[in-house]
Amino acid sequence: MKKNLRTASICVQGGYEPKNGEPIEVPIYQSTTFKYDNSEEMAMLFDLKKEGYFYSRLQNPTNDVVAKKIAELEGGVGAVLTSSGQAANFYAVFNIANCGDHVVASSTIYGGTFNLFGVTLKKLGIECTFVNPNDSEEEIQKAFRPNTKVVFGETISNPGCAVLDIEKFARIAHKNGVPLIVDNTFATPINCRPFEWGADIVTHSTTKYMDGTASQVGGVVVDSGNFDWMAHADKFPGLCTPDDSYHGLTYVKAFGKMGYTTKLVAQLMRDLGSIPAPMNSFILNLGLQSLHLRMRQHCANAQKVAEFLQNDERVAWVHYSGLEGDEYHALAQKYMPNGTCGVIAFGLKGDRETAIKFMDSLDMINIVTHVADARTCVLHPASHTHRQLSEEQLKEAGVAPDLIRLSVGIEDVEDILDDIKQALDQI
């Protein structure tokens, strides 16, 4: 077993240890089911008394190898791949919270997640209070209720590029006896490992930087194994009391630090599905092998682009925490001293139509919903990803009407700058 590998080596070789004569690349187990020689062996799998595979809706060897690699990158004890980042965030919360429960979440999060927490979870009987992440601990504490079960935030918010004070949010969550979930999609474990700052569970849309090529849609939930569920057993009956659907098994008692991820697979994957296809996981693993190299280039290119935008008189404002004058620069230096990500938020002087004209004038840079892959792309969140929100909700989410989200890729930075310059000349 490979031990104590550094981050770059985990990207390349983590999660998979081929034996003598086996393929060097992770095999694709494109099979729905798995054969056993006797009935008793399969019965033990269904009772969770034996490790193994019997149906790919629950677990698949290809998926598990890639999940293990991501867990190693984040410093977690276990991980579960999902079919999308949205599924990962839903499962991470729904594995803890039930009908009648409450969630506290940062207001500066991705529009789809904002809607998931504010609308969809509400239909399931789970209410959410959104808080300004820049507020004091005392102010955020006011959002908590006796039935609060989890706190949620994004390391770097999408699309506003705000940096979460992870230690502060972890401190507040733990004071109230609940775990902190952090969506680490934009920073990736290359630039930030939230578990080292007190987070308990990490999620990703693996569709983004981890994949890097816009070739597959996926997500992942990673557990640190650090949260003491039994110390707050009254809050988390699903983890700390017998499960009637598994002959009275209690997940935390039976599986210890793996209790959270085991429950996620045994209950949520069993009942709701959302497992990725093995081929998608294979593609994701190819992306992970170069993640450390790509993030370095994303950050270097984004820094140069942000500095250019900051100095152009046609630009009204720029949010990129790599800039010394940015309001989140100090937090970025604390949590991500080696770089943040390739995403920049900025606004042009003028109105919403000015932003649209600029985007329509771009040549090499693509207008797409996607973000955080090898290609440089651009989006106007108020018109696209967040268009379902009201003006008040847009303000609460930190999405200004003039905000342009620029995801800087790994092309030659001079070509990126040339395209931005010619588009600015046309507004």
Report residues per predicted region:
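Conserved N-terminal alpha-helix of the aminotransferase class I/II PLP-enzyme fold
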Residues: N38-F90, G112-T120
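N-terminal "arm"/small-domain region of PLP-dependent enzymes with the aminotransferase-like
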Residues: M1-N60, K68
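Conserved small-domain helix->loop->beta segment predominantly found in fold-type I
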Residues: L272-I275, M279-S281, L286, S290, ...
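Glycine-rich beta-alpha junction loops
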Residues: Y16, Q30-Y36, G225-N226, L288-S290, ...
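Conserved PLP-enzyme active-site core in the AAT-like
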Residues: K2, A8-E17, A79-N311
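PLP-dependent enzyme catalytic core of the Aspartate aminotransferase-like
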Residues: G118-V119, E127-C128, K142, P146-K149, ...
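Glycine-centered tight turns that cap/initiate beta-strands
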Residues: G75, N147, R314-W317, M364, ...
